[in-house]
Amino acid sequence: MFQPKPLVIVLIGPTASGKTELGIEIAKYFNLNIHNVDSRQLYRFMDIGTAKPTKEQQKTIKHFLIDLEEPSSQVNAKQFQEIATKSINRELNQNRIPFLIGGSGLYMNSIIKGFFAPNVPPQKVLRSQFEKLGQEKCWELLKICDPVLTKKINYADQVRTIRALEVFYVTGKPISSQKFQNPPPWKILELGLYREDLKERIFKRTKNMFEFGIIDETKKIINQYGSNLPLLETIGYREAKDVIKENLKLEKAIEITTTKTIQFAKRQKTWFRNKNNPIWLNNKNLLKDAIINIKHALR
């Protein structure tokens, strides 16, 4: 007897496009829980700099896949895929519809398309050596080892740069050539969110981020885990760290973070258009358009 595939709803879009707010409204309407697919929100204490759903928002709607690990841990896409798939299957076993929200294209596609990279365990000695080299030299190495990947990830993304070098040094092959696909047995509805005023939204969010605590948040992380944490080299935290060290003025930190975030958002948009091809929601009535598409998928 034919068994229809279970539905999994996905909302993707660039950073600062309003995924969290829209996602919560959708979740309320359909009585859904939310699975956050974000490469930084899965770490504890990184709240302001990652625009993590607030405690109030988490009380309104149950959120999964956030605050899972210490910032000193390094979870790769393969590990996240395994954690997320278990979380999704738990919901499916309860006859609920999983709802995934995120802007991390690599992590999202590892889940919904079944892409996975070689399962190379963390190499502590190698990682330590790469961290001592610094991101600039590691990036130059990566351009030699895996030029394909350097066109897909942010040059300031130390976590993914080191992971890619780690895989290359262990296997002798670039990570971009070792990805395989094993699609999960789900029916995927992909909704895309993009705002025409995204640059203005990014500037406003970055300004608020610095005004409302990313510097204090960064200080606390440094005090507990040290200043060499790879996650502190990601957008926002790197600039906050430079303010703390008095290497940057606050205004310049906001400017640099805004520019980096706009560049990152452009790459996200390109990724989603090329790799995902979602149903892009109508900006004039996002919630209504999302509801119509979800109801259609539920028929």
UniProtKB/Swiss-Prot annotation:
<comment type="function">
    <text>Catalyzes the transfer of a dimethylallyl group onto the adenine at position 37 in tRNAs that read codons beginning with uridine, leading to the formation of N6-(dimethylallyl)adenosine (i(6)A).</text>
</comment>
<keyword id="KW-0067">ATP-binding</keyword>
<dbReference type="InterPro" id="IPR039657">
    <property type="entry name" value="Dimethylallyltransferase"/>
</dbReference>
<protein>
    <recommendedName>
        <fullName>tRNA dimethylallyltransferase</fullName>
        <ecNumber>2.5.1.75</ecNumber>
    </recommendedName>
</protein>
<feature type="binding site">
    <location>
        <begin position="13"/>
        <end position="20"/>
    </location>
    <ligand>
        <name>ATP</name>
    </ligand>
</feature>
<dbReference type="InterPro" id="IPR027417">
    <property type="entry name" value="P-loop_NTPase"/>
</dbReference>
<feature type="site" description="Interaction with substrate tRNA">
    <location>
        <position position="104"/>
    </location>
</feature>
<keyword id="KW-0547">Nucleotide-binding</keyword>
<dbReference type="Pfam" id="PF01715">
    <property type="entry name" value="IPPT"/>
</dbReference>
<dbReference type="GO" id="GO:0005524">
    <property type="term" value="F:ATP binding"/>
</dbReference>
<keyword id="KW-0460">Magnesium</keyword>
<dbReference type="InterPro" id="IPR018022">
    <property type="entry name" value="IPT"/>
</dbReference>
<keyword id="KW-0808">Transferase</keyword>
<feature type="region of interest" description="Interaction with substrate tRNA">
    <location>
        <begin position="38"/>
        <end position="41"/>
    </location>
</feature>
<keyword id="KW-0819">tRNA processing</keyword>
<comment type="subunit">
    <text>Monomer.</text>
</comment>
<dbReference type="GO" id="GO:0006400">
    <property type="term" value="P:tRNA modification"/>
</dbReference>
<comment type="similarity">
    <text>Belongs to the IPP transferase family.</text>
</comment>
<dbReference type="GO" id="GO:0052381">
    <property type="term" value="F:tRNA dimethylallyltransferase activity"/>
</dbReference>
<feature type="binding site">
    <location>
        <begin position="15"/>
        <end position="20"/>
    </location>
    <ligand>
        <name>substrate</name>
    </ligand>
</feature>
